[in-house]
A protein has these predicted regions:
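ATP-dependent carboxylate/acyl-activation modules
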Residues: 1-23
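Glycine-rich phosphate/ribose-binding loops and adjacent secondary-structure elements
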Residues: 26-201, 205
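Flexible, active-site-adjacent loop/turn segments at secondary-structure boundaries
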Residues: 11-14, 23, 122, 179, ...
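Glycine-centered secondary-structure boundary/capping sites
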Residues: 18, 105-106, 123, 153, ...
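C-terminal extensions of enzymes
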Residues: 201-259
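Glycine-rich phosphate/pyrophosphate-binding loop
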Residues: 13-17, 25-31, 258
């Protein structure tokens, strides 16, 4: 979920959502009868599973915070939950205020590591997959970031902003981004509801670029994990293959400190 800024709530969106135009919309809406993590997680997973007729796996997605482990612990006892997706502090979205995007959340690496080690203690590391997101590949090193997170315990990664930049031509960057995706004026038409803007986006070309990007990413990832003897399976939790030259980070993530 997030916040659909009032700039984007035009007549069409307002009609679909049944609200006045020009009003910011929290998404999803709050459940006033749920006052604990346990109740919220149970409601979320059960409702989604019921909506899909119990045929599609459901992966709740949460922000990387101090409560992420509490959510994960509840998922280990929830028969409806198939896994957990965690979005770190570097994640970018067009559905939030800048203060939310730039100054909230925990680093994804520490949350993923804590979650995996917690699952190991419970003997459930192969039963409840964790997916990492948030700024992965933001410096053009998607495969390397992915490999590191997998070795820390992630079962996979989710990528959004990097795909928009590499495949859809997003003009934003970490150092000089345009900062207007959240107000509906994206010059590439990616995050705009204005027909004069979104018609600039060639969806077919972007779709092909996405395919090409993931095929290239798959090749690069195999180049990294193959020397570890994992050419056909992911080295989930193989932290002995990781090292870092910062003793504090090494201690926090429980990986090797190398000079």
């Amino acid at each position: 979920g997030g916040l659909l800024m009032w700039y984007k709530v035009n007549r069409l969106i307002a009609a679909i959502r049944g609200v006045p135009a020009g009003v910011s919309l929290p998404s999803p809406p709050t459940h006033q009868t749920k006052y604990s993590i346990e109740e919220a997680v149970a409601k979320m997973t059960q409702s989604m599973y019921m909506a899909w007729g119990f045929r599609v796996p459901v992966y709740p997605k949460i922000s990387a915070t101090s409560t992420a482990m509490a959510v994960l612990n509840n998922l280990t006892r929830n028969p409806y939950a198939a896994g957990l997706a965690i979005d770190g502090e570097d994640g970018g979205t067009g559905a939030a205020y800048n203060v939310s995007m730039n100054h909230m959340g925990h680093p994804i690496a520490s949350n993923i590591r804590d979650g995996y080690l917690n699952l190991v203690k419970l003997g459930m590391q192969n039963q409840v997959p964790i997916f990492a997101g948030g700024g992965i590949g933001k410096n053009g090193n998607l495969a390397a970031n992915t490999a590191a997170l997998i070795m820390l315990g992630a079962s996979g990664v989710q990528v959004g902003k990097y795909i928009m930049q590499a495949a859809a031509g997003c003009l934003g960057s970490e150092n000089d981004r345009c900062n207007i995706c959240n107000i509906g004026l994206c010059p590439k038409g990616i995050t705009s509801q204005d027909p004069r803007l979104y018609r600039r986006l060639d969806a077919e070309k972007v779709a092909q670029r996405v395919v090409d990007l993931y095929l290239s990413f798959d090749t690069e990832l195999k180049k990294i994990v193959a020397p570890l003897g994992r050419s056909t399976s992911l080295p989930i939790g193989m932290s002995d293959a990781l090292g870092i030259d910062d003793p504090n980070i090494a201690k926090r993530l429980k990986i090797k400190y190398v000079v």
